[in-house]
Amino acid sequence: MTPPMNKLTSKLGYTFKETELLNLALTHRSANGKHNERLEFLGDSILSFVIADELYRRFPKVNEGDMSRMRATLVRGNTLAELGREFDLGDYLKLGPGELKSGGFRRDSILADAVEAIIGAIYLDSDLETARSIVLEWYHGRLEEIKPGASQKDPKTRLQEFLQGRRKPLPVYTVTNIKGEAHNQEFTVACEVAGMDTPVIGKGTSRRKAEQAAAETALEQLTNG
């Protein structure tokens, strides 16, 4: 059963005047009728502009090459899919029977496309400045962490590439504990990696940070062990 839509809009930080726009943004092309690809096209362009503009302002002395690499890191599919999981977007997607059966609600590409479509929907429901402020709020932590010239691959990406290069299955991340009040929570995540006897534990102030911490530890153990 789909959770109440107000839970999603609360996580997004935006309440739609036209709820049909949000419904359309959540509708994959595998479902019959109208779908989210036009909104995705629009949202992709808005996201790219907003992130480019923010990087230009934040890093006045950084060259075009570094800014392009930072933008690519922030707007790539797996970053958008991470955002989608933070919003529990998979619980709200409207998919056709085939995609539902094959677990499309967990697929990175479908989650990433839906995030872009939601950005397009927010823009159409409001204006560019509102869409910009929402996107920058979503990206606040990532923008604070990103640095020019540094490796733009986060620990989860590096762990995934390490395992893929050795033809091993991808790691599985599970939230095992959340403690504290909503504004001051600590997440504990277990990361299961093929070939490691016990799951690796990571902690952080968000699910994403806990997963990254677990991936970093797993990488250290795999490369040093």
UniProtKB/Swiss-Prot annotation:
Digests double-stranded RNA. Involved in the processing of primary rRNA transcript to yield the immediate precursors to the large and small rRNAs (23S and 16S). Processes some mRNAs, and tRNAs when they are encoded in the rRNA operon. Processes pre-crRNA and tracrRNA of type II CRISPR loci if present in the organism. SUPFAM superfamilies: dsRNA-binding domain-like, RNase III domain-like. Homodimer. Its cofactor is Mg(2+). This is Ribonuclease 3. The active site is at residues 44, 116. Residues 5-127 form the RNase III domain. GO terms for molecular function: double-stranded RNA binding; metal ion binding; ribonuclease III activity; rRNA binding. The gene is rnc. GO terms for cellular component: cytosol. Mg(2+) binds at residues 40, 113, 116. Residues 154-224 form the DRBM domain. It is found in: Cytoplasm. It catalyses: Endonucleolytic cleavage to 5'-phosphomonoester. GO terms for biological process: mRNA processing; regulation of gene expression; RNA processing; rRNA processing; tRNA processing.
